[in-house]
């Protein structure tokens, strides 16, 4: 999937659920997370100890497209509710998997997948664009200074 299509979906999602830059004054996202159930999405929050025992702390989020379930450890959920950028990125990344229609498949090929074929890149891009749209993350500007 091309970046333009991902951007279209991310921006439309944010607009559809009412999370836009103008509504950024709200510092807690718990009501938004709870409202996902209206759309059939379950946000399953696991106790940190249970998460660590299950995943060996090798991941910080999981998405099951078959059941429309996103599972995260409690520390990610709590920080995301408070608007912490990294925690929000984790949840929006997992939402990206769902909203972009990803299925759990293995890549069987002699070549690495291209960037646009990579589901992780797509979910990261979705999260980046969504976070920009809601005013959490802004594009960093860099200036080249020559002496």
Regions found by a protein language model. Give the residues of each.
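Active-site hotspot residues in diverse enzymes, especially metal/ion-binding acidic/histidine motifs
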Residues: 1-147
């Amino acid at each position: 999937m091309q970046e333009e299509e991902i951007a279209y979906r991310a921006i439309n999602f944010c607009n559809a659920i009412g999370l836009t830059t103008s509504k950024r004054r709200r510092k807690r996202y718990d009501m938004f997370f709870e409202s996902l159930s209206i759309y059939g999405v379950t946000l399953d929050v696991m106790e940190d100890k249970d998460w660590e025992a299950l995943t060996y702390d090798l991941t910080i989020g999981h998405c099951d497209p078959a059941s429309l379930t996103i599972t995260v450890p409690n520390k990610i959920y709590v920080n995301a509710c408070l608007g912490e950028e990294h925690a929000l990125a984790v949840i929006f990344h997992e939402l990206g998997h769902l909203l972009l229609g990803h299925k759990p498949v293995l890549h069987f090929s002699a070549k690495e997948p291209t960037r646009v074929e990579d589901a992780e890149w797509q979910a990261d891009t979705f999260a980046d664009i969504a976070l920009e749209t809601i005013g959490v993350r802004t594009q960093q500007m860099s200036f080249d200074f020559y002496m």
